[in-house]
Amino acid sequence: MESLSPKVFDAAVAVTTEILKFTSPADVILSNYFKSNRDLGSHERPVVADVAFSVIRNKTYLEKTSGSEDALMLCLATLNKVFGLSLKSLKTKVAARWHKDIQRLGDERAGELSISDRYSLPDWLWQKLDKQYGTDGASSLAQSLLRKAPFDLRVNLVRSSRDKVLAELAAEGIEATPTLLSPHGIRLKNNFGLQKHRLFLQGHIEVQDEGSQILAQLVDAKRGQMVVDFCAGAGGKTLALGAMMSNSGRLYAFDVSAKRLERLKPRLKRSGLSNVHPQLIGSETDPRIHRLTGKIDRVLIDAPCSGLGTLRRNPDMKWRQKEED
């Protein structure tokens, strides 16, 4: 936590305070905060995000062990108990006005933690996982959800190659490795201010989890084919398919949400793909779909669901969702 400072810590507390209201997605709150606080540098923003998201991942564990639900105490607790900073070290990283609060972290907290508190899961979600996977399997899964999700990129083969991108990142001192399963993926050690980087702005790379890249690979879309991506959303897998097709053929990106398709537009422009055709549909019975009957070579359907599969990347969802959702 070299970039942690009183300024960065106070920013983390401010962001965490807003996220803990659970009125909006955490990533939206974080993005809006950074837009309003442009004095935070490129090395400071990732630290703010890491602290805030660590609190959300470990929320009930931190509440029980710190004896507080206050954002300030939870940020101090996550730095001590999750990131491993000693109480003495913490005092050098935060403003003097918080030193008394740091001392409170040293107080012993009586009582055993329940298994759902230990893994910071709502009781209903732990019970669901336990029933489906058994205690050992559920514990293993719950433990993995406490770890920060990897930061993966997909290389746009229409613009570049994985080797070229890796070489350029290495030349800039950015630590990156090829993904193990996706032939087009790159895993970063740290976020490096991606959205302002030339490779991103010119469409050479896109942020995409390796799992999503593999799903696109399984479609096996080929040059010159006609392909449909139902539930295309913001188009992550659509763009991967378009590149796999070597910017040839015809790729329809269908969705019932105009808002989601709107988010595809800037990504599509950066990608340089001309074979992608976003189309808003009313339902699965839309006439535009029926006109394609018998003409399509490949279909991808990644339908929206509860979203619980994204908990590692969106840990606030476990607190914003209810069992009935």
Indicate residue ranges for each PLM-predicted region:
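Class I Rossmann-like S-adenosyl-L-methionine
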Residues: 1-195, 245, 295
